[in-house]
A protein has these predicted regions:
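Short active-site oxyanion
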Residues: 34-38, 75, 111-114
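Residues that scaffold the ATP/ADP-binding catalytic core of kinase and kinase-like folds
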Residues: 11-13, 51, 125-126
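Short beta-strand scaffold positions
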Residues: 4, 39-40, 78, 98, ...
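Acidic catalytic patch
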Residues: 42-43, 65-93
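Acidic, PIN/NYN-like endoribonuclease modules and their adjacent C-terminal/linker elements
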Residues: 104-133
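Alpha-helix capping/helix-boundary segments
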Residues: 8, 44, 83, 102-103, ...
């Protein structure tokens, strides 16, 4: 199993470079034929959301659609997948940034919730708590 960098997933999702997109599709097809998976680090998911939002102007619904599509891709294996799923659910339901959703979900997965924060939006997450003054 190999790991993937953010730029590979960006190229695959936005499909703005035919040559690179073709190479990525071939890589995924090859992994499927060998019944292998490719590893996606949690930090890649954080960076991917940021790139889609800031560089490609994806709106929140489009980001959710893209990230959920990745989770459904059989050839991809995610670091701490329960945290990714929980973060996406929290992001879909609330107003907190995706990064805060990931941080809180990662705390939850490790049994360290709530995540203490000074961010009022993040504090509304089920796995977070506003640090009182």
């Amino acid at each position: 199993m190999a790991g993937l960098d953010t730029n590979v997933l960006v190229r695959w999702l936005v499909d703005d470079d035919a040559g690179q997109s073709r190479r990525i599709a071939e890589m995924l097809e090859s992994a499927a034929r060998r019944d292998e998976t490719l590893f996606v680090p949690l930090t890649v998911m954080l960076e991917l959301e940021w790139v889609l939002r800031s560089r490609y102007a994806f709106a929140k619904p489009d980001i959710l659609l893209a990230l959920n599509a990745l989770l459904e891709t059989r050839e991809l294996e995610f670091q701490t997948e329960p945290a990714v799923e929980r973060a996406l659910h929290a992001y879909r339901q609330g107003t907190a940034d995706f990064a805060d959703c990931v941080h809180a979900a990662a705390c939850w997965v490790e049994g360290k919730a709530p995540m203490l924060t000074l961010d009022a939006k993040a504090a509304k997450l089920a796995d977070a708590k506003l640090l009182a003054a």
